[in-house]
A protein has these predicted regions:
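Boundary at the C-terminal end of the N-terminal hydrophobic targeting segment
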Residues: 16-19
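Short, solvent-exposed coil/turn segments at beta-strand boundaries
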Residues: 31, 53-59, 74-77, 120-121, ...
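A short, Trp-centered hydrophobic/proline-enriched beta-strand micro-motif
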Residues: 27-47
Length: 183
């Protein structure tokens, strides 16, 4: 009888510790308040690099490596891109695919209902179709961390963002999500 109980507990313990791919990704997202990372972005063949901080929900600050003057920032309602020429472009966040990418609760709800696609045993992909947006979200198959996304941007350009040097739940300055003032 003791052997049967031992086998039962071993099987149940292994099932608990090794949940499904979706469960692991969802738990990882639930436990994430913010992300800091380096990125490489490819928009129709034009490659830009920099670093970003995401704070859930819906806040992002990215500093591009273009003369250290191009930034992208969202305060949760608006998205502003300040170019290296000091020109500001302001958008309603809800009109961009970032509205969904920056909302971890939306991602969790979508992932629960979607079928994952495993790519080369290294990446996990979920394709989200929402409000005429196609968003592909990619996770690492080893640690279930976010590693990038692919969208059509507000100009219908294909945008691919790769994440590296990811840090989770770091102390961040709250004022970095303040929108830059118009000239």
């Amino acid at each position: 009888m003791k052997k049967i109980l031992l086998i039962f507990f071993i099987i149940n313990f292994s099932n608990l510790s090794f949940g499904s791919i979706k469960e692991n990704i969802i738990n990882n997202l639930r436990n994430t308040d913010n992300l800091s990372f380096d990125f490489e972005q490819n928009i129709n063949g034009k490659i830009e690099k920099g670093n970003c901080v995401i704070e859930y929900p819906k806040k992002i600050f990215c500093n591009y490596n273009v003369d250290d003057s191009k930034i992208l920032v969202s305060n949760g309602r608006y998205l502003v891109i300040k170019t290296d020429n000091n020109i500001l472009y302001r958008y309603s966040l809800e009109r961009t695919p970032l509205n969904y990418i920056l909302d971890k609760n939306f991602l969790i709800d979508e992932i629960q209902d979607l079928e994952e696609k495993i790519i080369d045993d290294k990446f996990i992909n979920f394709k989200i179709l929402k409000d005429d947006n196609e968003i592909n979200i990619f996770f690492n198959s080893t640690n279930y961390n976010l590693i990038g996304w692919q969208t059509l941007d507000i100009y219908q350009n294909l945008s691919i963002t790769y994440i590296s040097s990811l840090k989770i739940n770091q102390l961040i300055e709250k004022n970095i999500f303040k929108l830059p003032a118009s000239n």
